[in-house]
Each structure stands twice: as C-alpha cells, then as structure tokens.
UniProtKB/Swiss-Prot annotation:
Binding site for UMP: G54, D74, T135, G136, N137, P138, F139, F140, T141, T142
Disulfide bond sites: none
GO terms for MF: ATP binding; UMP kinase activity
Subunit and partners: Homohexamer.
Listed EC numbers: 2.7.4.22
Enzyme class (EC, first level): transferase
Protein's recorded name: Uridylate kinase
Record function comment: Catalyzes the reversible phosphorylation of UMP to UDP.
Activity regulation details: Inhibited by UTP.
An example Gene Ontology biological process: UDP biosynthetic process
Alphabetical keyword list: ATP-binding, Cytoplasm, Kinase, Nucleotide-binding, Pyrimidine biosynthesis, Transferase
Location(s), subcellular: Cytoplasm
Length: 240
C-alpha cells in the first residue's frame, strides 16, 4: 500500500460509540473492534493518540440542567472519561499493544498525569496514548480536550468519529436530500452555521491550523484507509 499521509494522529471517540446497541455503559464487542482499528493504524506506522468522551456513563451538562452544580457535574464527567480510557487501555493491551493513559486530573494510583513532553515520548516509543479527563477544567467538552491535546502533541490530523459519515448541509437523519461535504474551510463552517464540534474546540483547531476530519467509524478498516490518503468523510482545514 501507499505511504501514510499522516505520521501522528489524534482520534476522538464519543463515549456513546462504546455502547453499541445498548443505552448505557460499554459493549465489549464494540470496544474490541475499535481497539483492533487503532492497533491496525499503529502497526501501519502511525503514532496514535486517543481521546474518549464519557457520555455513555455520565453527562455533567445534562444533570446541571436538572439542578446539579455544573462544576460538580463536569468533574463527574471527567471521571467517566477515565473509566472509558481504562477500558480501552485494557482492550488494546489484550491485543498486545503498549498503552499509557494520561489524565488531566491527578489519579496517580490509576494512571499518569498528562505531561506534554512525556506524552510525545510515549508516542515516539511506539505506545498508544489515551488522554483522559478532558482539559481538566469544568465547562470544557472532550471535543475541546481533543483539540487541545492534538495541538500540544503536534498531531498532523485530528479525527473525530461520529454517528454520521461526515458533515452535511442539514441533518441527514431528518432530510433525505441532505448533501455531504467532501471538504470545507473553517470559515465556510462558520458562515454556513454547520455543526462540527463545540465552539471552543473549533476555535482552537482553526487558530492552530489543525486539519480536522469528521467521519463515521462503523465500516471496518476506515481508519487505516484515511491514513493512506483516502478521502473519507469531510476534511476541514484552512481558511477561505
């Protein structure tokens, strides 16, 4: 096959992606399939980092709307991402990978603290790095955490796996005539009011000229195909 188009990537997975057909928690078959995809990409020569959301376990913003203190809820959400990171670490290690979980909040008996230079070193040594607990601050989503970590480690591409296979001009679940974009600039996303990721995360990626690809991960082998340069999903980069 062709050489890889990207040397170092950060893959953002939603917590819901781990649920499979369930309403809550982690489906072992799903996390095992995702782990195979990640290892396949790494074995092809890519340095791979992951950020996983926590929505399959807990959503701080949702409970805040019901009266819970927002900061407390967000801290609980951060812990949910650590749970998912540990589950993914276990799945990857069972397949023979070397993995390090690095948290933005201190849980020293469970995982490492996030230290930028150490994270980069892990990747250079062939380890998969999983970044947990978002940015470590309330009021920021795991999308923001993914964008921040991708910039910090010097990722060539931020990949966001979603339930749909790219960015559309309108909701494809509600509109049969929805059109998918193959590529967009950051300015076009803003002007057209398209939903790609939350505002803070989007601003981070745009201001750092970080290429972002939105894609669906339901098809086996899709991550490796992207690494080899196939135009899958929607690529967001540059300015108009």
């Amino acid at each position: 096959m062709s050489e890889l188009s990207y040397r170092r990537i950060l893959l953002k997975l939603s917590g819901e992606a781990l649920m499979g057909d369930g309403d809550y928690g982690i489906d072992p078959k799903v996390i095992n399939r995702l782990a195979h995809e990640v290892i396949e990409a790494q074995q092809a020569g890519a340095q791979v980092a992951l950020v996983i959301g926590g929505g399959n376990i807990f959503r701080g913003a949702g409970l805040a709307a019901s009266g819970m203190d927002r900061v407390t809820g967000d801290h609980m959400g951060m812990l949910a991402t650590v749970i998912n990171a540990l589950a993914m670490q276990d799945a990857l290690e069972k397949l023979g990978a070397k993995v390090r979980v690095m948290s933005a909040i201190k849980i020293n008996d469970v995982c490492e603290d996030f230290i930028r230079r150490r994270a980069i070193r892990h990747l250079e040594k062939g380890r998969i790095a999983i970044f947990a607990a978002g940015t470590g601050n309330p009021f920021f989503t795991t999308d923001s955490g993914a964008a921040l970590r991708a910039i910090e480690i010097g990722a060539d591409l931020l990949l966001k796996a979603t339930k749909v296979d790219g960015v559309y001009d309108k909701d494809p679940k509600k509109h049969t005539d929805a059109v998918r974009y193959d590529s967009l600039t950051y300015d076009q996303v803003i002007l057209q009011g398209l939903e790609v990721m939350d505002t803070a995360a989007f601003a981070l990626a745009r201001d750092s000229d970080l290429p972002l690809r939105i894609f669906g991960m339901s098809e086996p082998g899709v991550l490796l195909r992207i690494l080899h340069g196939e135009q899958i999903g929607t690529l967001v980069q540059g300015r108009s």
